[in-house]
A protein has these predicted regions:
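Charged, solvent-exposed interaction patches on well-folded alpha/beta domains
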Residues: 1-104
Length: 104
C-alpha cells in the first residue's frame, strides 16, 4: 500500500531505499510519504519504521544492519523512529517485566 500526498511522484526514491535490503523490503506492507518529505514504512503490519527526511537510505541500511547482527525486527516493536540524526528510538509493542521473586 502506497499513501501520502506526492507518494507516486517519489516512488523512485522509495524503491532506491528498499533496494538496500530485499529481506526487509519484502516484508514492508505499507509506505507512507509524510508531508511530501520523508517515508514511514510499515513492517509486517505492526512495526512502523519512521525514516528521516535527510539520508533515509543510511537510516534504512542501519536498521538492516542491526536486524542482521542482533535480530532487531524479530522483537515485538511498535515503532523504530530514525528521524533524529544519529539516534534510534525504539518503542516496544508491550513491555514485559520479569516476575518479582518473593523468596529473595
Amino acid at each position: 500500500i502506497l499513501t501520502g500526498e506526492g507518494a507516486v511522484d517519489n516512488i523512485s526514491n522509495l524503491l532506491n531505499i528498499l533496494a538496500l535490503n530485499n529481506t526487509i523490503s519484502e516484508k514492508v506492507t505499507e509506505a507512507r510519504l509524510i508531508a511530501n518529505r520523508r517515508w514511514s514504512l510499515k513492517y509486517l503490519k505492526n512495526t512502523i519504521i519512521d525514516l528521516p527526511e535527510n539520508n533515509p537510505e543510511k537510516a534504512f541500511y542501519k536498521v538492516a544492519e542491526l536486524d542482521k547482527k542482533y535480530g532487531l525486527l524479530l522483537n515485538k516493536l511498535k515503532k523504530i523512529d530514525l528521524r533524529v540524526n544519529d539516534r534510534m528510538i525504539i518503542q516496544l509493542e508491550t513491555l514485559v517485566l520479569p516476575e518479582k521473586d518473593n523468596n529473595i
